[in-house]
Curated annotation (Swiss-Prot):
GO (cellular component) term, any one: cytosol
SUPFAM superfamilies listed in its UniProt record: S-adenosyl-L-methionine-dependent methyltransferases
Pfam families linked to this entry: RrnaAD (PF00398)
Catalyzed reaction equations: adenosine(2085) in 23S rRNA + 2 S-adenosyl-L-methionine = N(6)-dimethyladenosine(2085) in 23S rRNA + 2 S-adenosyl-L-homocysteine + 2 H(+)
Protein name (database record): rRNA adenine N-6-methyltransferase
Superkingdom in the source lineage: Bacteria
Top-level taxonomy: Bacteria, Bacillati, Bacillota, Bacilli, Bacillales
SMART domains, sorted: rADc (SM00650)
EC number annotated for this UniProt entry: 2.1.1.184
Gene: ermA
Keyword terms of this UniProt record: Antibiotic resistance, Methyltransferase, RNA-binding, S-adenosyl-L-methionine, Transferase, Transposable element
GO biological process assignments: response to antibiotic
Family listed: Belongs to the class I-like SAM-binding methyltransferase superfamily. rRNA adenine N(6)-methyltransferase family.
GO molecular function terms noted in the UniProt entry: 23S rRNA (adenine(2085)-N(6))-dimethyltransferase activity; RNA binding; rRNA (adenine-N6,N6-)-dimethyltransferase activity
Annotated residues for binding of S-adenosyl-L-methionine: 11, 13, 38, 59, 84, 101
Length: 243
C-alpha cells in the first residue's frame, strides 16, 4: 500500500523475514524482469533485486523513491521511476512479472490496468481479503470482466501484524495468471456492455423471453445465481447469435 495519496494509509511490511516469506510464494526467478507497484521504503525491492534479472520500481512519492534508491544501493539491476501507476505505460516488447503491495482504495483500478493494459503473465499483489474474494465472484461485474483474461488465486494470508501500522482488515497475497483470452478483442466492448446489464438483471433488455429460455437451456443452467465461467460465456455467445 505504497502509492501515496492524502486519503491513503501507508501500511508497510518491514520485517525481512515476512518479506522473504511472502516472496517465496511467488515464482519470480533470476530470469525475470519485475515491475514493482509502490516500492515504498524498498523492503520488497531489496529482495526482488536479488531474486530477479531486473526491477523497475514505480513509486508516486518522491521522498520514498529516494528511500528506495538508498535501500537497494549499490545494486545496478534496478530502475526507480516516480510516477502514478495508473498513468504508467507498461512495456510492450519485453516479458515481465508484476509485484505490488497496493493501496486498498485504488485496488480495482490497478487490477483493471494490469489485466487490460499490461502483458504480464503473472502478477502478484497483496490486497484486502474481501477484495480478493470479489475478484473471484462471478456474480459481480469485475469478476466477470477479469475471468476472460485471468485466473485469480489466493496464495497466502498476510495477517495485520505483518504491517506497520496494522490495518483493520485481513490481507492476502494473490496471483493473477494470464491465460488465452476467452473472447476475441472485437467482442470485448459488446461483452463489457453485456456484463453490466446482466449483473443489473436487465435480462429483458438483452433477450426476448424465448431467447432467454433458449440461452439458459443451451448453457445447461439450473440456477441462474450460480453460473460457471463456461455457462456465462455460453449465454453471452447465445446473445451474440441473437444480435
Amino acid at each position: 500500500m505504497n502509492q501515496k495519496n492524502p486519503k491513503d494509509t501507508q501500511n508497510f511490511i518491514t520485517s525481512k523475514k515476512h518479506v522473504k516469506e511472502i516472496l517465496n510464494h511467488t515464482n519470480i526467478s533470476k530470469q525475470d524482469n519485475v515491475i514493482e507497484i509502490g516500492s515504498g521504503k524498498g523492503h520488497f525491492t531489496k529482495e526482488l533485486v536479488k531474486m530477479s534479472r531486473s526491477v523497475t520500481a514505480i513509486e508516486i512519492d518522491g521522498g520514498l523513491c529516494q528511500v528506495t534508491k538508498e535501500a537497494v544501493n549499490p545494486s545496478e539491476n534496478i530502475k526507480v521511476i516516480q510516477t502514478d501507476i495508473l498513468k504508467f505505460s507498461f512495456p510492450k516488447h519485453i516479458n515481465y512479472k508484476i509485484y505490488g503491495n497496493i493501496p486498498y482504495n485504488i485496488s480495482t483500478d490497478i487490477v483493471k490496468r494490469i489485466t487490460f493494459e499490461s502483458q504480464a503473465k503473472y502478477s502478484y499483489l497483496i490486497v484486502e481479503k474481501g477484495f480478493a474474494k470479489r475478484l473471484q465472484n462471478l456474480q459481480r461485474a469485475l469478476g466477470l470482466l477479469l475471468m476472460v483474461e485471468m485466473d485469480i488465486k489466493m496464495l497466502k494470508k498476510v495477517p495485520p501484524l505483518y504491517f506497520h501500522p496494522k490495518p483493520s482488515v485481513d490481507s492476502v497475497l494473490i496471483v493473477l495468471e494470464r491465460h488465452q483470452p476467452l473472447i476475441s478483442k472485437k467482442d470485448y466492448k459488446k461483452y463489457r456492455s453485456f456484463v453490466y446489464k446482466w449483473v443489473n438483471r436487465e435480462y429483458r433488455v438483452l433477450f426476448t423471453k424465448n431467447q432467454f429460455r433458449q440461452a439458459l437451456k443451451h448453457a445447461n443452467v439450473t440456477n441462474i445465481n450460480k453460473l460457471s465461467k463456461e455457462q456465462f460465456l455460453s449465454i453471452f455467445n447465445s446473445y451474440k447469435l441473437f444480435h
